[in-house]
């Protein structure tokens, strides 16, 4: 009959400090069908990050060579570092029927939507500017200049929220995760997603 359905694309965007990474990890744990899109980046690894698992860490020169060769489905410069999503690896996963989860910024989301022409795009929002600033300070990893830059970038990113398919305010982690989970399940039930399953059912009638 063929596989149950085709792979889907789920894209999460959020200002830094909104809780996107926590939500992403929970989704990957609950749904083994997900494959996480491992981005390439020129930034330095943070404590605990593993090359090839969290990111592919490369030099600026190597990144630019890959970009110019058409290697990326999307790429962007964020906070002075480059990030990019490998195109072929993404298409291979989707062809295998895997669902692919992206954790990218709004620039990348625009490019990815144009490149792949598919998927559910979800924007994770902080409850307020004050709460976002509190979370950034509580992390204890950024200096004042970096915090100010992240807040300024957050304001720009929030203006892009209307371009997304769904918005989730993360003022309560459990509720935010329930909403994200529902958005994913809704996408898996869409006619576009289940076209492979329908093709398999109809094949026997066409013989």
UniProtKB/Swiss-Prot annotation:
What Pfam families does UniProt report for this protein, alphabetically? Guanylate_kin
Q: Name one GO cellular component term.
A: cytosol
Keywords for this protein: ATP-binding, Cytoplasm, Kinase, Nucleotide-binding, Transferase
E.C. number: 2.7.4.8
Q: Which GO terms describe its molecular function?
A: ATP binding; guanylate kinase activity
Q: Where does the record place it? A: Cytoplasm
Cited InterPro entries: GK/Ca_channel_bsu, Guanylate_kin-like_dom, Guanylate_kinase, Guanylate_kinase_CS, P-loop_NTPase
- What catalytic activity is recorded? GMP + ATP = GDP + ADP
Q: Give me the residues that bind ATP, please.
A: 14-21
Domain Guanylate kinase-like span(s) in chain numbering: 7-185
The answer to whether keyword ATP-binding applies is yes
Q: What is its main location?
A: cytoplasm
Tell me the disulfide pairings in this chain: none
Q: Which family does it belong to?
A: Belongs to the guanylate kinase family.
Function, as annotated, reads: Essential for recycling GMP and indirectly, cGMP.
Checking HAMAP family in the record gives: Guanylate_kinase (MF_00328)
The name this protein goes by in its record: Guanylate kinase
The UniProt gene name for this protein comes to gmk
